[in-house]
Structure formats: C-alpha cells, structure tokens
C-alpha cells in the first residue's frame, strides 16, 4: 500500500476509533494516530486491516473546526487529497479543505459510505440482516403478535381473553374464571401482549403474601417477565438510592399486606405512574357502602391512579351480588356507583341471558322474547335478523348466530368481565379418591394427650392445625431427631405404594418442608427410590432442577416430594398419581394441591391417594372434604363459603378428634348446604357471558393457527444462524434440546438471557412444558428479540460484496442488491407495527438500472454467491465506484414508487380498521354503558395519531451488496 504522512485511513476492525492519520512509516510498518480516542495503532504495510478514506464529488464532509463542505472537485498532490467546494455555513464557494484537517470523529454508518470506505462485512451477516428485517416485519404484522411466545398450552378460551383484552387501551377488566381455568395465565398473557406491543411499560402486581412466589415463578417461567419482589427489606434498601423506591423498577410484585401496613408506601406506589395494576384474590377485599375495609380502600386508591386494572377473583355466584358489585366499582366507579341500580340492571340482563338460551337451543322465540331483543338491540339494525329468527331454514341459524354475537357486544358487563366455567370449557379429566385408613400409632396417641395437657391455653384454631400433623407434635416433645417415620404407618404405606407403581410418576404433597425432606431420606435409604424434593427453602434454580429431575422420562425421579408452599405455581400434568401425605386445613389449599395435576392438558384421570390415621383430625377432615363438600372428586366453588360458615364447629372437631358426637349430622348439613349453593350457582349461570368469555369457534381457530406456528423451520434456521454469528455456542442434547453458552468470540461481551452457566432451550412447546428448566424459543422470546435488536441496531451486515460464478454473464458484470426499509417513527403505544412495521424492500439492479428482484428470489440467489477477501473487495469497490453511484441513483427512483404504495396501503388499512372500531364502539355506547367515555376518546385520538404518523412515514437504505460476476 502507498502511504504518505497526513493521509486519512479508517480501521476495518475498530470502526469506533474514528478517522486515523498516518504519522509515521518505514519499509515494513505504518503508524496511525486516532486523535478522537488518543490511541496509536501500528500496522504491517503489506496486510494492514485499514481502508483509505477518499470522498467523492457530491459528498458532504466536516472540518476539524466544525464547518461542513459540499465537495465539487478533488485535487491530489503527492498522495494527499484536497477537497474543493461550497461551505454550507456561509455559502462561500471555492473553499478548500485538506484531508489532514478533516474531523477525526468521522465514522461510516450509512451502507453506501461503509461500502466505499472499504468497511465490508461478511456475506452471511448481510443475509442475516435481510432475514432479520424480513422476519421482524412479518411477525409484527401477524394479528396474534404477543400471544404465541408464552410457555403454556394453547387453550382457546385463554387466548380469546388475552387477545380481546390485550388489544384494548388501558384495559380494566374482571377475570372470574372458575378455579383451574388459568386466570393467572390469562393475566400474564394480557401483560405480555400489552408490553410487547408498547401499550404498557410499567406493571404493578399486588397479591396475598402466600401467592408471591407463585406469581414470581409464573411470570418468569411462562412469560419471561422479570418482576422485582418488594418486601420490607427491599423497600428500605431502595430508599437509600431513590426518593421513590418503586421508580427503580419497571415490573414490581408485592403483597397486599406490604402495601396496607404503611401509608408512605401507598403514597409512593400511587406516584410511580404505572400502566397496569393486577390484583389477585380480589374477592377477599371486603366492602360495604358504609364501611369498606382498609384493603379495599388501598386497592381503590391505586385503581384510581392507574389506567389499566386487572382484577382476578372468584366467580360472581360464589361472591354474592354485593361483593361482585364492589369489584366492578373498582374498575369503573362512574359506571357502577349505585348498588340498587346495578342489581336492577342485572335482573334485566338475566332475562336477556334466558332469551339467549332459547337462541342457542334453537327454540322458537315468543312475542315477549322478540320484544326484549328488539329493545336490547335498538340502533343496531337488527330488525331483519329478528324477522328471520323463527324461520325453519339455514338462514334461521345464521340469524341466531349473528343476534347472539350482537347481544354479546351489548351485554351489560361483557366488556368488563370474563368468566369461564369447567362445564362450559370441557376437556377436564375425572378425579378419583382412594382413601386408606391406617391405625393411629400409640406414640402419637401419647403425644396427643401430652399436647392436650400442655396446650390448654392454645387458641382453638391453633390446636386444630397442630392435630392435623401428628409428626410435628411428636417432634416437639421428642426433639428434631425423633424418628417418627419408623412407626408412622403412612411411611411404610408410601414405600409399598411406590414399589407397586414403579413405572408411574407420583406427586407427594405434605404440609411442611421438614416432612418432605425426611420422607426423601427414608425412601432413598430403605428402598433406593429416586425422589426429588421441592420446598420453599430451595432457590429458584434448585427448584427448576428438582422439577426437571422429576420430569425426565429416562433417568428421572419416580416421586416428587413437595411442601405446601414449595409447590405453589408449579404444575405437573405429565403425572396423574397424587399422594396427600396429610391434608391441608382449608378447601382452597386442597384445590391448590389437586390443581398441580388437574389442569387443562391433563389427559388421564387423576388418582388421589390419601393415607390417613384413624381416630385423628385427618380422619375428620377427610370426611368433611369428601362427604360434606365433594371436594376431592369435583371442584368445590362453595368450599370457602362453607368453611367460613362452619369454621368454629369444624375447628372444634379437629381439635378434639375423639369427641365426635354430632359429626355425622354436621357433615350431612354441610352437604345439604353445599348442594343448595351449587344449584343456586348453576341457576345463576349467565350463558351469554360464558359464550362471550370462551370465544367460541374463532378462539379454537386462533389456537390452531398458533399451534401451526410452533416448530417454525424458519425460526429454527434463523436462530441457529443468529447464535453462530453472535458467537453463542450450541450444544445438542437429547429430546430436541440445545444448551446455549457464551463463547470467547462473542459480538458483545454480555448477551442478555444467556448466562455463563448456559441455558437450555427448545423450539418445541410440549417439550418446554414438560421440563421446567427449559426455555421455549419463539419469535417473541427475549433471546430472539435481543438478537434482532443487536443485528438491526448496528451496522453489522449493511455493506457486503460477493462473487457470482456465472458463465452466462460477461466477466465483470455488476449487480447491486439494495435493501431499503420503509418505516414510521412513532411512540410504541400507537402500535404502528400493526400496519407498517419496519418493512424491507429489496431491489436487485443491473448496470442499466433494471430491477431483477421479482425474478430472482433472495435465498436461491444467495446460495449461488461466494465470499471474497476484504482487501480484494475494497479494491473492487474502488475500481467500480462511479458505476455504483449511478446504480444507486436508479435505485432511489425505483424505490420511491414502491415505498409510497406500501405507505398508502398501510394508511388505508389503518383508517378502515380504526374507523370501523370507533364506529362500532359509538353504536354500542348507546346500548352498553360499560363502554367508557375515555375509551372512546382514546380510540379516536389513537386513530388521529396513527394516520398522522403514517403520513410522515419515510424510507432509507438499510443495506447494500455489490455482486461481481466471475468465471473462476
């Protein structure tokens, strides 16, 4: 290379150094000073990874003094360049600027500038960049964006609710599905979709203390949402660094008690500007018109300040009308301000729901029903449908379906409440109880007597709880080393049971972590039974390992021993055998235990085994659960209400299991009350609301569509290519698993979500569900999204040169591949990506400016190309630079027409969709006051802003590749 002192060069490998100046040279070496960074670099003359910087007429350059020059001509003298042109600051013409006086901060980021400066990327990076642009555009256009990346089964009713609510502005809804139908997953899906689409950025979740860990695990494992758990310690520490600790995190999880106990915390929470508030177990917020509870007031204050609110609650039939009204009042106090008016309205809608039953059952409608429907659907042009509804032909069916859909839209609370029932969803397995009575050991009888003598001052409920766990009482008196497992018949029963079911996975749940640990030791030492232990003392990583050990079909544990708290938030549908080593003290916990297996997706009947001690509190509680509530073999929506009603009596029987006078009558009374309440709930079912909540056939189609997206071969190929280029090592494991680890040649020193220890991934949803430690990779996973951002936010791959071996074309023939991006810069919450995501337009030009891209598909063409060494590529570019400039000019003219057509199409689509939604809501507002005024205003303003930003959309060159034909 010919070097001259004062020449300007740029580093091919360290672009961030800026413009370098030749300050020394000899026969073998050359020294460059990069004054921006104050660093020198010494290179070998013959093979230096640097490129001569030479600008062209028409370019604009900046002097070291800051003024800019539009170049007209260039002079070269003794190897040094002088640029002559017009100063842009004062208009002076004929100005000169020697290259040594160019601004050293200059870097090349535009694709054409990097190409001409010799900063040419590898061919595979150009291909990855184009694929990233293409896939990014396609994924954001998909209507299901935000729904498919969850690590959960694709359940139609859950997808319907998430899709319906997740696309709203500041949704305020009540999620009231029956237990086991996935309210937590629905809330997580809504949060995930709102965040992915830019509608929300800051989320606050408030739950009972006992559910904190469950929510933390669910949000992380299923949705890749990293919530920060705030407790007293975390809050106090954060106060040292911030005036408002809650502003230090975007996603916060805390308990209701944590908020309730401190007025300052509540003030800080209300000032932190959240987008969404999520409240679990909202039915425990006690309210009356004259005396609302402190808990209710806390949530009411938060709900007043936070635009989006999701309340997770028991079904309205369980709560009673007034309690249900209290929940709705939190969502929309203007709409639900008068309880009596609400009760009257609900009675009116009850008549509508009954009429819907006639529609769904294909029964004829009498005059009263027709009048009611006409009144309810006034203003919606339903007269023609009503006239056809009693006709006995196919049109009749169509009219009934359309009328039902219109009623769902106009239903009183259908926009603010979703409630699915097991009866409506179907697909659940049967539950079978296998109770095994075992003799009460003498050691426990003695311990009970001693406890009775010594615990005379205990509260009744404390005494009752102690009596449920005799091994705990025995250890209190004999010490922690007491070997209760040597005489407790439940232990030997468990050993024999597991030996009989060697080929089955068995979940064992007990109340205390200590019991689980002791049982694992016994199983291991007595019979060598492989068991994993799961309790609250384990870290999240250790729990994952235990769950994975249990899930492994080949060499995994036969049994998983869980404590009560440790099992929260984990589901094991692949197992169907459950052993309750003891019983929990309330029906909610019992259902929570069974719910570890009894989930949608369970394909076998659940066998519930309860070894219990005769003449003990366990025997009493077993009878009450089974005979009084039917809580083992069916879900028990009445359980909590009856538990609260009968609390004192039940605790008395549990505290003194030997005094059973009247127990049978008590249990019979409970069963009668249970049956009556259940019948009352069934009678109160709102079929219209259920129909609206489960989504019907469209929800099933959505689930099927998403299922077809799983195992997308394009995603797999793109991800593996991405990992290779970023420098993430991949180790194949069995069962479609990959282990990702950072390598020594990473593009970035620290890639998010890939730790030093590595992470296990799969592209298979079922595999991810079966193995807790495995991450489910989709287009929405942070690893893929961060990889896309890494590629597209840098210059990587935006400049390339390739050789095309084709003897049908003359040697030296030039082709220019141009990737333009059409985009609109707008706030994320407008979701312009629905209409115009950053969309690539590809041109493939010959020397005459003819676009060959429609005839030459990218992937097929790319496979015919060969790489070329960088120095050779740099020389080739320099030799043909004038021709490339001309081809670029042709490209600018060609792309303008295509880009504007794309923008016009996006604007028309946005106008059509958003105008239709606004018109629909305005029409419904007349018959459904649940549609809020601010929601209408938000939709109208959203439409205006979207159309304005689409009008301002533009395009730019994102990547360039020069192709040179060769015959070698």
UniProtKB/Swiss-Prot annotation:
Leader sequence residues: none
Domain Helicase ATP-binding positions: 164-334
Keyword Transcription regulation attributed: yes
Keyword match Transcription regulation: yes
GO-annotated molecular function: ATP binding; DNA binding; helicase activity; hydrolase activity, acting on acid anhydrides
Sequence motif DEAH box, location on chain: 280-283
Annotated EC: 3.6.4.-
Positions that bind ATP: 177-184
GO terms under biological process: regulation of DNA-templated transcription
EC top class named in words: hydrolase
Domain Helicase C-terminal: start-end pairs: 493-644
Keywords for the protein's UniProt record, in alphabetical order: Activator, ATP-binding, DNA-binding, Helicase, Hydrolase, Nucleotide-binding, Transcription, Transcription regulation
Purpose of the protein: Transcription regulator that activates transcription by stimulating RNA polymerase (RNAP) recycling in case of stress conditions such as supercoiled DNA or high salt concentrations. Probably acts by releasing the RNAP, when it is trapped or immobilized on tightly supercoiled DNA. Does not activate transcription on linear DNA. Probably not involved in DNA repair.
Protein family per UniProt: Belongs to the SNF2/RAD54 helicase family. RapA subfamily.
Oligomer and partners: Interacts with the RNAP. Has a higher affinity for the core RNAP than for the holoenzyme. Its ATPase activity is stimulated by binding to RNAP.
HAMAP family noted in UniProt: Helicase_RapA (MF_01821)
NCBIfam families, alphabetized: PRK04914.1 (NF003426)
Protein name (record): RNA polymerase-associated protein RapA
Name of the gene: rapA
